Amino acid sequence: GVPRTGASATEGGLETVVENSVVLDGSAMNQIINIDIENMQATAQCGVPLEVLENALREKGYTTGHSPQSKPLAQMGGLVATRSIGQFSTLYGAIEDMVVGLEAVLADGTVTRIKNVPRRAAGPDIRHIIIGNEGALCYITEVTVKIFKFTPENNLFYGYILEDMKTGFNILREIMVEGYRPSIARLYDAEDGTQHFTHFADGKCVLIFMAEGNPRIAKATGEGIAEIVARYPQCQRVDSKLIETWFNNLNWGPDKVAAERVQILKTGNMGFTTEVSGCWSCIHEIYESVINRIRTEFPHADDITMLGGHSSHSYQNGTNMYFVYDYNV
């Protein structure tokens, strides 16, 4: 059987080598079991949409901190099974950093439960056998995740225009190494940036940050970012209102997702991404090499109408790149 919940994945997970297989749809297991404010965790069945859980938490002043692009469609079981990551990962981490406990069913019907405790010191951490297994080892039926205070009124936005990706990677590294943790730390190349920033940065790379949380922490994070970027006089700061507007329109709702499907069928043009991560010492070389090789070696390069990329998940020892393609089908 192939587990499925929100059906938001794009990697062909329902395709199997077996001609006739069963799809186990868990979307009907859609109860929020508990929101535990004292212990700062929430428990939900696998079919609870992330957006439903998030809205329930925000009504109480809390958040999961998890906000992948698939948020309008994705459900909790699939988010854990695919080892998902969200747009605020630089502060909150990825799903593997958020999961406290789990319930799952093995192939023989055995129900296994991993308790909700802050840490384990004995043996391997079984959570990490389940997280990311994509249904190969078990069916995830229940998830408990950490929750955090939700204080959007404290959000601070910073945006910069720069000439090249190398400078942007250097700035991201300095911010991470100095210990600052903005919830958003994004670097767009000129091509990918044309989808968002032509009104103020056409033809330039763009660096974006959002600091959030306790106002003192947000203020210190923002000041630290500004101080680091000031070491690079070639970077030009833009009005924070432009970045706030971008942020408020970053995620799509179900209506816009449905409209895009219609547009793809009508035009035959669609987009896709490939993500890689790399250490600070090699990420710029990876970026330049991939872009160059696709343009010069890919036999269908002429069908690509846009090729670019952005970094949006940074770590102490490196960052990621999403390579973004628009192409004619």
Which sequence ranges carry the predicted segments?
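Glycine-rich N-terminal segment of FAD-binding domains in flavoprotein oxidoreductases
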Residues: 1-29
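C-terminal substrate-recognition/cap domain of FAD-linked oxidoreductases
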Residues: 162, 169-329
